[in-house]
């Protein structure tokens, strides 16, 4: 019994030690959740995207900001968090519930919430307590404007099935970009300036 307790204690220490302290957003669990959320979004497909071509719109995904080198190290975590929070907010609405299979939608919202909780666990550790006011950060404002454009589009289209299908495809792009950012952070140990 003492051996088992020692082993468990060692595992806890390793997970909170230098190797495990790269920040919760770099965890393997977060990457698995991200892949599962993309898989769920793919399964939510109800219409052929080709039948909705007339409703296409360029929402202006700040892809080069998320996937490129435009983000500073201290901006990457807040941008990732904001992308996930806005995605959750989009799918956790009454209009969304009416548009999608509720089982898949609930699983997606649960997965996004899990990612947010994982990120929130070390929010202060990664950003510093003094940096927690992020509303004025330019990249965050860019992400918020991007999602506001999606909300405006859905409202303009009367939350039609085709509008939701276009948004579903767009959200796959957005979450793929955020996953790319997570991978970059994982490869560099949180330092975006590393080669």
Curated annotation (Swiss-Prot):
Q: Which GO terms describe its cellular component?
A: extracellular space
Q: Where in the cell is it found?
A: Secreted
PROSITE patterns annotated for this entry? INTERFERON_A_B_D
Name of this chain's protein: Interferon tau-8
**What family classification does the UniProt entry report for this protein?**
Belongs to the alpha/beta interferon family. IFN-alphaII subfamily.
- Tissue distribution: Constitutively and exclusively expressed in the mononuclear cells of the extraembryonic trophectoderm.
Which GO terms fall under biological process for this protein?
A: defense response to virus; female pregnancy
State which gene encodes it.
IFNT8
Q: Which UniProt keywords apply?
A: Antiviral defense, Cytokine, Disulfide bond, Hormone, Pregnancy, Secreted, Signal
Q: Name one GO molecular function term.
A: cytokine activity
Q: Which organism is it from?
A: Ovis aries (Sheep)
